[in-house]
UniProtKB/Swiss-Prot annotation:
CDD domains: LACTB2-like_MBL-fold. The keyword Metal-binding applies. One of its GO terms (molecular function) is metal ion binding. This is Lactamase-like protein nscB. It comes from Aspergillus fumigatus (strain ATCC MYA-4609 / CBS 101355 / FGSC A1100 / Af293). Its EC number is 3.1.-.-. Keywords: Hydrolase, Metal-binding, Zinc. The keyword Zinc applies. It holds the Pfam family Lactamase_B. It comes from the Eukaryota.
Amino acid sequence: MALRMPFNQAFWEEYLSGQDATLPSLPDTSTLTSRVIRILGGNPGAMHLQGTNTYLVGTGPSRILIDTGQGLPIWLSRIVGVLQSNNISISHILLTHWHGDHTGGVPDLISYNPTLAEHVYKNLPDLGQKPIEDGQIFAVEGATVRAVFTPGHSVDHMCFLLEEENALFTGDNVLGHGFSVAPDLGRYMESLELMAKLGCVIGYPAHGAVIDDLPSKLEEYIRHKEMRVQGILSVLVKERERVEGERGKEGRRKGGMTLHEIARAMFGTVPDEVIDQAMAPFLMQALWKLTEDGKVGFEPGDPVKRKWFAVARRKTRPSIRRQHGSVTSR
């Protein structure tokens, strides 16, 4: 059984509802290129944009399927229609990660074609699934798909690189509209950097329209997260400077702010329930990342009342080394 991290629906809704509400309409099924067909999951909403994108990949009679939607009957009807009208079948089912809007259609597909039970792949597989290794290749006629381990949005998240198109199926790491969320911000930002280094031009996201300029989108994502993290650090640095200024030379106290105080310093008057349900997940992950980076510390105790503080920068001193009985600096 795969290790799973908590999934905060309210946090998703806070992020996505704040983005452009006028999303472009997407067809239920679309032939995007000669080797990629997109089938919408039939589950539009604040969390899923126009719905979960699922993709049939390849050019021959046997295709790779990436993700399976939420498990709604309308999706099964759509994909069966595509399979039958094109006289094609599914060779592999590749799941980007464990969230139900990506894995929910697996049982329906197996009911439709029981032989598919032996061909379901996921990183950190659940019972009955086969593992996906970083760098593993899945190939059918017209398509070579390479798995790329990109955790952060979820502990098991995989992207898939389509070599023939220099395109990347980005899963939930990068969306077609707005920004995604990440319970593990540090690993997520590392994954974004890794995705950028792949050099893919096109992005096929799990939600939203095709990304025509993936490098620019990744740069935007990385900059957005860095600005959020830097904003939190700036608030804590100002608090430390305020405390030290008030206490003068005796200002040994670090200064500190609770999660709620940080949120209000950044966003103004915000109700406690909004902070707890919508802002706390990102703030906590950003604070832990800053802690891992050595820029922020905290006082042990009740997480709600815990004080976070900016770590003072240490003045660098010349390094000292001994040479032939003398002491030199450099």
